[in-house]
A protein has these predicted regions:
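Intrinsically disordered, low-structural-confidence terminal and linker regions
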Residues: 1-5, 9
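Nucleotide-sugar donor-binding/catalytic module of glycosyltransferases
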Residues: 18-169
Length: 169
Protein backbone atom coordinates (compact mmCIF):
# COMPACT_ATOMS: atom_id res chain seq x y z
CA UNK A 1 0.00 0.00 0.00
CA UNK A 2 2.92 2.33 0.76
CA UNK A 3 4.54 1.71 -2.62
CA UNK A 4 1.23 2.36 -4.37
CA UNK A 5 0.81 5.61 -2.44
CA UNK A 6 4.32 6.74 -3.33
CA UNK A 7 3.68 5.82 -6.98
CA UNK A 8 0.52 7.94 -7.10
CA UNK A 9 2.37 10.83 -5.47
CA UNK A 10 5.24 10.61 -7.97
CA UNK A 11 2.89 10.33 -10.94
CA UNK A 12 0.40 13.08 -10.04
CA UNK A 13 2.30 15.37 -7.67
CA UNK A 14 0.99 16.72 -4.38
CA UNK A 15 -2.14 18.36 -5.80
CA UNK A 16 -3.03 15.30 -7.88
CA UNK A 17 -2.32 13.00 -4.95
CA UNK A 18 -4.68 15.02 -2.74
CA UNK A 19 -7.36 14.95 -5.44
CA UNK A 20 -7.04 11.16 -5.82
CA UNK A 21 -7.12 10.69 -2.04
CA UNK A 22 -10.27 12.82 -1.75
CA UNK A 23 -11.93 10.82 -4.54
CA UNK A 24 -11.18 7.57 -2.71
CA UNK A 25 -12.37 8.85 0.65
CA UNK A 26 -15.62 10.31 -0.70
CA UNK A 27 -16.35 7.45 -3.10
CA UNK A 28 -20.03 6.45 -3.15
CA UNK A 29 -18.96 2.84 -2.62
CA UNK A 30 -17.44 3.72 0.77
CA UNK A 31 -20.79 5.03 2.01
CA UNK A 32 -22.98 2.46 0.24
CA UNK A 33 -23.59 0.33 3.34
CA UNK A 34 -24.60 3.34 5.41
CA UNK A 35 -26.93 4.61 2.70
CA UNK A 36 -28.58 1.22 2.23
CA UNK A 37 -29.14 0.88 5.98
CA UNK A 38 -31.20 4.08 5.94
CA UNK A 39 -33.79 2.37 3.74
CA UNK A 40 -33.98 -1.02 5.45
CA UNK A 41 -37.06 -1.67 7.56
CA UNK A 42 -36.87 -1.77 11.34
CA UNK A 43 -37.80 -4.91 13.29
CA UNK A 44 -41.16 -3.29 14.01
CA UNK A 45 -41.76 -2.62 10.31
CA UNK A 46 -40.76 -6.19 9.44
CA UNK A 47 -43.27 -7.46 12.00
CA UNK A 48 -46.00 -5.33 10.45
CA UNK A 49 -45.06 -6.66 7.02
CA UNK A 50 -45.36 -10.25 8.28
CA UNK A 51 -48.85 -9.50 9.61
CA UNK A 52 -49.95 -7.65 6.47
CA UNK A 53 -52.35 -9.49 4.18
CA UNK A 54 -52.53 -8.58 0.52
CA UNK A 55 -55.69 -8.91 -1.53
CA UNK A 56 -53.75 -11.29 -3.77
CA UNK A 57 -50.79 -13.18 -2.34
CA UNK A 58 -48.98 -14.72 -5.30
CA UNK A 59 -46.36 -17.38 -4.89
CA UNK A 60 -42.91 -16.15 -5.88
CA UNK A 61 -40.68 -18.81 -7.40
CA UNK A 62 -36.97 -18.26 -6.87
CA UNK A 63 -34.88 -20.15 -9.44
CA UNK A 64 -31.34 -21.06 -8.45
CA UNK A 65 -28.93 -23.00 -10.65
CA UNK A 66 -26.48 -24.74 -8.32
CA UNK A 67 -23.11 -26.30 -8.93
CA UNK A 68 -20.86 -27.52 -6.13
CA UNK A 69 -22.19 -24.74 -3.92
CA UNK A 70 -20.31 -24.09 -0.70
CA UNK A 71 -22.51 -25.42 2.11
CA UNK A 72 -22.27 -22.18 4.09
CA UNK A 73 -23.36 -20.09 1.08
CA UNK A 74 -26.31 -22.39 0.48
CA UNK A 75 -27.38 -22.20 4.12
CA UNK A 76 -27.13 -18.39 4.01
CA UNK A 77 -29.31 -18.32 0.88
CA UNK A 78 -31.89 -20.52 2.61
CA UNK A 79 -31.79 -18.40 5.78
CA UNK A 80 -32.32 -15.23 3.75
CA UNK A 81 -35.46 -16.74 2.22
CA UNK A 82 -36.72 -18.13 5.51
CA UNK A 83 -36.33 -14.69 7.08
CA UNK A 84 -38.50 -12.96 4.49
CA UNK A 85 -41.37 -10.81 5.75
CA UNK A 86 -43.47 -12.27 2.89
CA UNK A 87 -43.58 -16.04 3.11
CA UNK A 88 -45.42 -17.28 0.03
CA UNK A 89 -42.38 -18.38 -1.94
CA UNK A 90 -40.86 -21.51 -3.34
CA UNK A 91 -37.23 -22.24 -4.07
CA UNK A 92 -36.53 -24.08 -7.34
CA UNK A 93 -33.02 -25.52 -7.43
CA UNK A 94 -31.51 -27.19 -10.48
CA UNK A 95 -28.33 -28.86 -9.26
CA UNK A 96 -25.63 -29.76 -11.78
CA UNK A 97 -23.12 -30.80 -9.12
CA UNK A 98 -20.99 -33.92 -9.39
CA UNK A 99 -21.12 -34.46 -5.63
CA UNK A 100 -24.16 -34.76 -3.37
CA UNK A 101 -23.21 -31.75 -1.23
CA UNK A 102 -26.07 -29.51 -2.39
CA UNK A 103 -28.54 -32.38 -2.37
CA UNK A 104 -27.72 -33.30 1.25
CA UNK A 105 -28.24 -29.74 2.50
CA UNK A 106 -31.48 -29.30 0.56
CA UNK A 107 -33.00 -32.66 1.53
CA UNK A 108 -32.19 -32.01 5.19
CA UNK A 109 -33.86 -28.60 4.99
CA UNK A 110 -36.93 -30.08 3.27
CA UNK A 111 -37.20 -32.62 6.10
CA UNK A 112 -36.94 -29.82 8.67
CA UNK A 113 -39.73 -27.91 6.90
CA UNK A 114 -41.95 -30.97 6.87
CA UNK A 115 -41.31 -31.70 10.56
CA UNK A 116 -42.12 -28.10 11.49
CA UNK A 117 -45.18 -27.89 9.21
CA UNK A 118 -43.70 -24.89 7.39
CA UNK A 119 -45.32 -23.21 4.43
CA UNK A 120 -41.97 -22.98 2.64
CA UNK A 121 -41.44 -25.16 -0.38
CA UNK A 122 -38.30 -26.33 -2.06
CA UNK A 123 -38.43 -27.96 -5.46
CA UNK A 124 -35.17 -29.70 -6.14
CA UNK A 125 -33.86 -31.50 -9.21
CA UNK A 126 -30.51 -33.22 -9.44
CA UNK A 127 -29.44 -32.83 -13.06
CA UNK A 128 -27.77 -35.70 -14.89
CA UNK A 129 -25.00 -33.37 -15.98
CA UNK A 130 -23.87 -29.79 -15.54
CA UNK A 131 -24.76 -27.80 -18.65
CA UNK A 132 -23.64 -24.41 -17.40
CA UNK A 133 -25.50 -21.63 -15.68
CA UNK A 134 -27.87 -20.86 -18.59
CA UNK A 135 -29.09 -24.40 -19.20
CA UNK A 136 -29.22 -25.19 -15.49
CA UNK A 137 -31.36 -22.06 -15.01
CA UNK A 138 -33.67 -23.26 -17.80
CA UNK A 139 -34.00 -26.59 -15.99
CA UNK A 140 -34.84 -24.70 -12.81
CA UNK A 141 -37.59 -22.82 -14.67
CA UNK A 142 -39.28 -26.16 -15.34
CA UNK A 143 -39.80 -26.55 -11.58
CA UNK A 144 -41.65 -23.22 -11.20
CA UNK A 145 -45.28 -23.17 -10.06
CA UNK A 146 -45.47 -19.58 -8.79
CA UNK A 147 -47.06 -16.55 -10.41
CA UNK A 148 -43.82 -14.55 -10.29
CA UNK A 149 -40.28 -15.72 -10.96
CA UNK A 150 -37.06 -14.37 -9.52
CA UNK A 151 -33.52 -15.51 -10.17
CA UNK A 152 -30.69 -15.84 -7.69
CA UNK A 153 -27.19 -17.23 -7.87
CA UNK A 154 -26.36 -20.03 -5.47
CA UNK A 155 -24.33 -17.66 -3.29
CA UNK A 156 -26.80 -14.74 -3.16
CA UNK A 157 -28.86 -13.53 -0.21
CA UNK A 158 -31.91 -11.26 -0.03
CA UNK A 159 -32.74 -8.48 2.40
CA UNK A 160 -35.59 -9.56 4.68
CA UNK A 161 -38.17 -7.30 3.02
CA UNK A 162 -37.26 -8.08 -0.60
CA UNK A 163 -40.19 -10.35 -1.48
CA UNK A 164 -42.66 -8.17 0.44
CA UNK A 165 -41.61 -5.21 -1.68
CA UNK A 166 -42.08 -7.22 -4.88
CA UNK A 167 -45.66 -8.09 -3.95
CA UNK A 168 -46.34 -4.62 -2.55
CA UNK A 169 -45.71 -3.04 -5.96
Amino acid sequence: IVSKTVGVYKRYGLKGFCTKLNEKISSPMRTYGKRVAEFLPTEEELGAQREHRFLVEPCISIVVPAYETNEQFLKELLASLEGQSYDNWELCIADGSRTDQVERVIKERIRQYEDAGCRYKIRYERLKENNGISENTNEGLKLVTGSYVGFMDHDDVLERNALFEVVNV
